[in-house]
A protein has these predicted regions:
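Short linear loop/turn motifs
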Residues: 19-29, 42, 211-215
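Aromatic/hydrophobic pocket-lining residues that form π-stacking "cages" and hydrophobic walls in ligand
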Residues: 23, 68, 105
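Phosphate/diphosphate-binding glycine-rich loops and adjacent basic-rich segments that engage nucleotide
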Residues: 28-75
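Well-ordered secondary-structure scaffolds
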Residues: 57-60, 64, 74-321
Length: 321
């Protein structure tokens, strides 16, 4: 799908490339800022990636480590928590490869003087029920306000938040850290902070309360019905992402424009019991051709069977230095 910044660009007026003055103002007033790197932060990284692209070393764990950490270390972080994903929707699909990457990242970052840990999280199914740009922003706001919270997203989000409290030495006890993260989410503070951040970075002051009126919607929506009754056995997460790209919600080439309105919502999780014809998901498209292609892609990505499958926990392992 689109990148994180493409999703935030769905918000009218929001700037993902603020100057240092606005960046500092946002952090001071809101407490956080979701922004992109500037051209002068680890500028050599883009050159190295260009070389990797033509030398078949894009998947080199050592060079991936250098690329990821160059930006983090250059920013001068006091501590760092990494979410290293594995599974059919992750860059490193194989668990052992992902674990090797996580261990390398943690070892190098700690060696450079930044207190770092990593959580390994499962992407053998979508983390949330939405995939796209504006639809994911809506999903995130609904998550923050409590209008709708996908269970796997809640587990991973709270685990990462708690880990950050521990690694930054704000809270020594992991159980207490998790409780504090839970209170911030369910007490509404997280939604308030997000709303302040959006406003300081140029978005609407009432975005959290009225996000539905600000986010662009695709002109066509259609449900994808289950072809038979049964439990969801597996989901090809990468195929769902590719379907969003084909809708226009991601880039095939760097110069491609992103359609923020398109995407897929209502994605049923692994283990869900469905009747024949019950919606597996809803496709939001710009035209009929893209709509039908995405509906087929979603059907092809899902496997149903009579027996309920074993489900996995979303946070598989914690990697420490």
């Amino acid at each position: 799908t689109g990148g994180t910044l493409d999703k935030m660009d769905s918000i009218p007026g929001y700037t993902t490339q603020p100057d240092n003055t606005l960046f500092r103002k946002t952090v001071e007033e809101a407490g956080c800022a979701i922004i992109g790197q500037t051209a002068d932060l680890a500028p050599a990284d883009k050159r190295f990636y260009g070389v990797r692209d033509v030398t078949a070393t894009v998947e080199s764990i050592e060079l991936i480590t250098a690329s990821i950490l160059s930006k983090k270390l250059a920013a001068g972080l006091g501590s760092l928590v990494l979410d290293v994903k594995f599974g059919n929707g992750a860059f490193m699909a194989d668990f052992d490869d992902a674990k090797k990457l996580a261990k390398t990242l943690v070892k190098v970052a700690n060696g450079a003087g930044t207190q770092t840990t990593a959580l390994m999280t499962d992407m053998n199914e979508p983390l949330a029920s939405a995939a796209g740009n504006a639809v994911e922003v809506k999903n995130a706001v609904d998550f923050l306000t409590g209008a709708h919270r996908d269970p796997r997203l809640e587990t991973v989000t709270l685990a990462l938040a708690a880990e950050m409290l521990v690694v930054s030495e704000v809270e020594a006890d992991p159980a207490m850290a998790l409780e504090r993260a839970h209170e911030a989410l369910f007490g509404g503070q997280a939604a308030e902070v997000f709303g302040r951040m959006v406003h300081v970075l140029g978005g609407p002051a009432d975005f959290v309360e009225k996000h539905d009126s600000y986010l662009e919607k695709a002109p066509l929506t259609a449900e994808v019905g289950a072809p038979e009754a049964g439990h969801v056995q597996t989901i090809d997460t990468r195929a769902i992402g590719v379907a969003v790209v084909e809708l226009g919600g991601g880039r095939r080439r760097r110069e491609d424009e992103i359609d923020h309105a398109v995407g897929i919502t209502g994605l049923k999780p692994v283990g869900e019991k469905l009747d024949k014809g019950e919606p597996i998901a809803f496709v939001h498209a710009r035209d009929e051709g893209a709509l039908e292609a995405a509906k087929k892609a979603v059907l092809d990505a899902y496997t149903l069977a009579e027996k309920a499958p074993e489900t996995s926990v979303p946070v598989a392992q914690r990697i420490i230095g």
